[in-house]
Amino acid sequence: AFRQALEDAIELRHSAVHPWSEAWTSGKLDRRQLAEWVKQHFHYVSHFAEWVAAVYANCPHPEVQHFLLENVTEEEGFVGMHGAAPVRHSDLLLEFAETCGMKREEILNAQVNGELLPETLGLQSWCAVQSHKPFVEALSGLLIGLESQVPKIYSKTTPPLLEKYGFSEEEV
């Protein structure tokens, strides 16, 4: 009942229906804008394994710890997901940004160069704090609240990269 209530609440404000996602799926963005999105998104994704590891460290349930450890190893590229070759998730973003015309260094140095949006910094801060909350709160916020949105978002935003933006399968 708790998880369903949480999922229902997420659905009301799901990232897949955010105006940015709508602009993306309708083909209204250019490659530079997509690269700027990567610049922001990278600085969330590149820390996600750390935050999940903190939840793992505070988890009292061995079966959930196993799930969390699998999540960390997938994020960090030690194991592949769904039969795919292992690759660090943040590296996928860097490769996509390069495909969009942005240099890796620009993304990697965005935080120290003061180029992250307040919203990105706020999300980083919230995730860091959330990861050290009691286990149920941390798990609910980070994995159910945030990460569970990813499949729906990417299933909506990936096809337009091929169909409207002219990316190849390899680039995507």
What are these regions (language model features)?
Residues 1-21, 115-119:
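Acidic, low-complexity proline/glycine-rich segments
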Residues 9-14, 24, 28-60, 78, ...:
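Alpha-helical bundle segments that constitute or directly flank the non-heme di-iron/ferroxidase center
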Residues 30, 60-61, 103, 168:
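Helix N-cap / loop-to-helix initiation motif
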Residues 47-50, 64, 105-106:
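Short, solvent-exposed secondary-structure capping/transition elements
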